[in-house]
């Protein structure tokens, strides 16, 4: 098979390559006829012959090469030596001596090598004895096998016996050990495995990691229940907490699909709590050609679940766990397109470490409809929505929105003009709450805006390179009369962050409870650098500002305030490639009245080739939301963060990975990640060792160490950190997919 050395050389593959098959080159024979060719052939036809010197025996799809062969034609049996090679439908058997029946494909050989390839998966083995029990059926005695390149035995399965069936694609090993670098690392008395990469029920390789909670071990078992149905059972243990049981079921039908996933810990020794769990259910269903629906349900046992069992990104993104039932409908009606939706949604909101939470309203239900039709240059749009809002500790109510509008599109080669006019009508039916009695209120506002832009092009030369450069000035006028909205509730509305795209929105708010007043003009311009050959965008930069013709402004609480000046702050950006290997980006929100930046972020990434990336990012915000306080309001403060990340080869096939995310204002690291990855020269295995320390709350941190050993076409040992590295390091590449010279 080759050396057990972990650091395979390509020369070893050449020296141990699969034996080549010599064919006669003559016309194919009829079915079940046998051809014998050699330097010397003697014997009696139709009885027995002996062939010596470069023997070639062909029958059906099989070819046998040998130094000599005795062929008994009465029984269709061949004895061959001193060396032989037998080719059978993608498999090659080679060794010293062979006894083989050409008719029923049975026989045996000692000190034999078997090479097979099917559906892109390669297997190689060396055995004391091989028994051929029919077409595609083998039994290997005292054998070693792996899926590596010829000559690479950096890892292999050593077994007392292995039986393989090429037809079913299943192999069964008995008394088997996984040997890595010459050292046995796993043992099983019995195991079955797929030969062709197809799914099959059986034990999966254990996952292993360590960290603040001690050693974490899981022993998953996979159930291939049907071609469209499978399940995984994940029993495991966390040393400082206890036993954890998990599982997943996946199903797929032509009209629907879904995933059910869950974990359960009967008793958490560290928290001194019982029955800690999580449930995830996602179902999508195409009911008819026009009607689809689905369910998304998430639940955990307690507020600390994600902080205890997940990483920093999951903690931040799982504060409001979604529970939603939805139906979508689409059709052509009255010569236009209609889209409708019905939603029922309620969140499980998790409290922060101080026990505070800001729970959104439940939607019980929401019915939305939108009809659009184009007549000439006019696009007619009618939006309608009814929502019933329910909350345990706030005023309930329903909201009905009707927003018909018409937009005209006038386009030509130099630019466009798009005027739009509409009427936004909102009606509320509010229930009684505390000392407040039930009431009905409404708001009707006309909306008018004009969006216009131009595009100029020129050939440009920058640092000796030719580009097609555009200059794209844009004006956006928006008018909405001022109307106090402090008598209206705020069910689901928030303010958009101020950005370049925000300059061209008619409403500063997300949601229908607040509509800003407007009599403003946005003036902006952007430039793009394009590849003159294919038009691909390489770089884009822009800057813009809004000018107010009236100072009235509707605030988030519904009251009418006033802008302090007649123009907004500046916003600008620049993103793109500075060269083939350097990508940079910059975004800024600048207050020219105070001569200060309200926020900005600068990013640069050097990525000359896969597996080589260095990135740096600096982020500043003068008044950013930090955390929820006991009074239900958020605490705002300045943030200054630096984020450094890298993946880089430090020697051939050995890569270092790292990330350092530091909050300068709070004087504490948010995340530290450091590790190393290695892939073998012949590509048969790769390994990762990654350590991570990250923030889980205002005053809490967690540590984790992940080790992963990936064996080609077999499985992963340990806990694969790929997803964590992909999120932590912009431009990260899987080490085992990096091609090195």
At which residue positions do the language-model features occur?
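N-terminal amphipathic/hydrophobic interface segments
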Residues: 1-142, 156-175, 233
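Outer-membrane beta-barrel proteins and related beta-barrel translocases across Gram-negative bacteria
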Residues: 91-146, 150-161, 165-741
